[in-house]
Amino acid sequence: MFNDQLLAGRRILVTGGGTGLGKSMAARFLQLGAEVHICGRRKIVCDETATELMGEYGGRVVSHGVDIRNAMAVDEMIETIWTEGPLTDLINNAAGNFISRSEELSPRGFDAVANIVMHGTFYVTHAVGRRWIAAKLPGNVVSITVTWVRNGSPYVVPSAMSKSAIHAMTMSLAVEWGKHGIRLNTIAPGEIPTEGMSKRIKPGDEAGARTRAQNPMGRVGTMEELQNLAVFLISGGCDWINGETIAMDGAQALAMGGNFYQLRDWSDADWNQARDSIKAQNEKDRAARG
């Protein structure tokens, strides 16, 4: 679909690029000739991903260990990248989410999502954007959001609020920074099964089963479809698209309203089982991080 050197000369940062959707997009950018930077809290994971991708596709992938909730750490990472030259594109992919009845949310649980998704995304966008403006350079920002930025969603309120903030940031900065040649858009994908999503958003479900049963197209999304849309948005083939949120979900949001409405029918036992599953996964992840 795309010329093999479409992104040659581009330097792209993908947040949360060590796993899942971020890793997939990073791989495609690398295949198309870009120099790719990936970041995440667990540098060892990013290091392993960088080695894997370069071994498979060649090119250059640089890994960075950073907690994007820390504005100073973010700025230091961006400054380090800039010492070799400016970025041309930013992919805001890092996120966190889990299902919960809102009355059972703790402030800590809310902050765990909001600090990554809302604060972290702004910190990275601000650190990159102000450098583009100072250097009089154009740039592209593509953020990964969700379809429920337009209508909200029960049981994922921290994510709905935080992703809606990215949606608002995208529209606001598209207007403010457009005169500098900086474009901002978001992709709102439906279900593309990943390990992290299945364990905290749909614990106990077979990956993709609920979406296949409800989606007008009868299937989940694919990594390739996300890759293609991300490449298109930064490729230069659509330079007048700015401030948009593009849904890619097989019309599921139009048909169903949201991904989690059916959880209204869950019993207390269902919620207890989900909470125990999420808690066990959190403990497993903490142990893996040491």
Regions found by a protein language model. Name each.
Residues R101-A114, T211:
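Substrate-binding pocket helix/loop in short-chain dehydrogenase/reductase
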Residues G178, R183, I241-G243:
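Short, small/polar-rich loop/turn modules that mediate ligand/substrate recognition or access, typified
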Residues R11, G16-G20:
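Conserved glycine-rich cofactor-binding loop
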Residues T51, K179, P189-Q214, M256-G290:
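A glycine/serine/threonine-rich, flexible loop-to-helix segment
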Residues L105, G152-M161, S172, M197-R200, ...:
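Active-site loop-to-helix junction immediately N-terminal to the catalytic Tyr of the SDR YXXXK motif
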Residues T125, S162, T170:
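Active-site helix of classical SDR
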Residues T186, E206-I241, M248-G250, S277-G290:
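C-terminal helical subdomain
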